[in-house]
Structures are given as structure tokens and as C-alpha cells.
Amino acid sequence: MVRGDDQLNGLQGGKRALDILCVATERTVSAFAYEEIGETSTEGDKRRERLRRLRRLINYSLSTTMNSSLSKRLKIDECKNQDPEQNPNRVASSPSSCHLESKRPQKVVSNKPVRNRKPVIVTDEDRTPTEWLIDVMREVNGMDAKLIFVKVLPNSDVDELQTRLMMPWKQILDMDFLNEEELEKIDRHHKKISASDKGADVIVVNSKGLQRKLKLKRWDMTSTSNYVLGLGWNKVVTDNILQRGTRLRIWSFHSPDMLFFAFVLSDPDPAPTECLNLLAKLCEETTCLEALQEANRMSSLVSDTELDLELRL
């Protein structure tokens, strides 16, 4: 039986091999600098951008595979090693029999099958606040910045007919981003205590400083509970040109009297087929560059020879 650490070592070995391939590709391309062959800076920038996207896809795919495989293996090993007598009251302690006893949200687990989505890998770069976010916080006297959510947007989150952003609790990185007053407002709306209860106010801000005021609410579904940004969401989609595949990071922070969500966006990751096309194009361009450099070298040798003959004559 292959243990979790053995499988991890195997996956890490595969990652090292592909890292070597990626670095070799990069060095091959960089060996033919555009300054030496008359290539424009724009063409060079485009080539480096394609290489950057290729490396990002390789690292992303490997990280996803490693995390998913290791998690499954460790879960299987844990179940096999568990003593049945340690939990004789399994039915009574099932998550489906639990209920929320306070307004502080608890992550809900269901025993019903749900549609699996690829996990979003959160990197160290994701957890580093951007400069514009820090500037916005200074302007409004903001504090307590937290990375609370990372999501690759599906069609449903940018569909103008659905008009909402869904934030499942089990995907939220830090549930402790709301104060007691905001929790109270969300809870009152969820329980439909009064028609005047609309949820908690939140201001969404982007890198351009554009702000939109929305309502944060709670929706319960079969598989999980969610926080939802609803009315006015379509304007946010338009403001930020959100589309299917956009990678969205949400940072929360508080001014003295308001909750803020800062939207940090990344371009959609390239598809695997695009990755292969990029690699093929890089190899083709590298061959052309090598041929051009060799032609320039031969031309230089011919010129030197002719000059030498003229001097001798």
C-alpha cells in the first residue's frame, strides 16, 4: 500500500522534472535576446508573457494534483486507522443532526452528494496585500485587512439574469471577518424577522478606486450555506469586466463605520491546449532565432574575410 508521504515524494519528483523542462525552455528562448538580432521590445515582451503564462499553468496544474492526491490518500489512511469504538454514537454526532446555536456562522457539511469543483490554490502572492489596497485603506482609515475568498468565476456568477456572487462558507478562508452588528443584520434578514431587514451593507472597491454599495446576505442551499452579494452585482461585473474564468480575490477590511470588500483580479488561467500551443510556438520561434543568429554570424565572417583581403591587396 502506497502511503501519503510516498505519493507526495513521487509527485514532487514529477514537479521537479517539469520545473527543469520549464527552466530549460526559458533559458533557450532568453539565449537569443531581441537586442542582439534587431527584434522590437514589443515582440520580446509578448514572448516573455507567453512563457510566463506557460510556467504559471504548469505550476498551477502540479500544485492542484499534489494537493488533491495527497488529501485523498491521507483521508483513506485516517479512516483505516480509526478505532470504531472511539465514536460509538456516530449517528447522533452526524453533521446533519447539528444546528447553529449562535449568529456566528459555522461551516455546514451535508451527507448528500455534491458536484465537485477543482480546489483553488491560494499562493503566498495571493496573501500579500496589493499597494492600491493599502492606499484605499489609508484613505478611509481602514484596518484589519483579511484575505477571505478566492474563486475562479463560473458562468453563474457573471450571468446578468442571476445577479449575484455566491461565496460558499466552506470556501471562505477566514469566517471571522464580520462584526456583531453585521452578523445581526444578516441573521435578521435570513430569518425574515422584518421586511425592512435587507442584510449587511458592504462597499465593493476595485483597483481604480471605483466603489459600489451592495448588500451581503446569507443563502442556505442543500450542500452548504453561502454569503451572497446580490442587488447591484451586475454593475460590479460591468465595472470590472468580470467573465467566466476570471480569478477573483476578495479582501475585507473595516473603516470606522463600514465593511469593505476589495476586489483583486487575475486573468483567466490558460487552458491545457493553449499551454501546448504556447510551447510549440516558443520552440518554433527559438529555431527561427537560432537560424537568424547563425546567418548573422556567417555574414559577419564573410565581411571580415573581404576586409582582410582588401587590406592585403
UniProtKB/Swiss-Prot annotation:
DNA-binding interval(s): 169-267
Lineage top rank: taxon: Eukaryota
Subcellular location(s) per record: Nucleus
Keywords in alphabetical order: DNA-binding, Nucleus, Transcription, Transcription regulation
Matches recorded under PROSITE patterns: B3 (PS50863)
This protein's record includes keyword DNA-binding: yes
Xref: Pfam families: At2g31720-like
Region described as Disordered: spans on this chain: 80-110
Segments of skewed composition (Polar residues): 84-99
Taxonomic path: Eukaryota, Viridiplantae, Streptophyta, Embryophyta, Tracheophyta
InterPro entries: At2g31720-like, B3_DNA-bd, DNA-bd_pseudobarrel_sf
Encoding gene (name): ARF70
Protein name: B3 domain-containing protein At2g31720
Cellular component aspect of the GO annotation: nucleus
GO MF, one annotated term: DNA binding
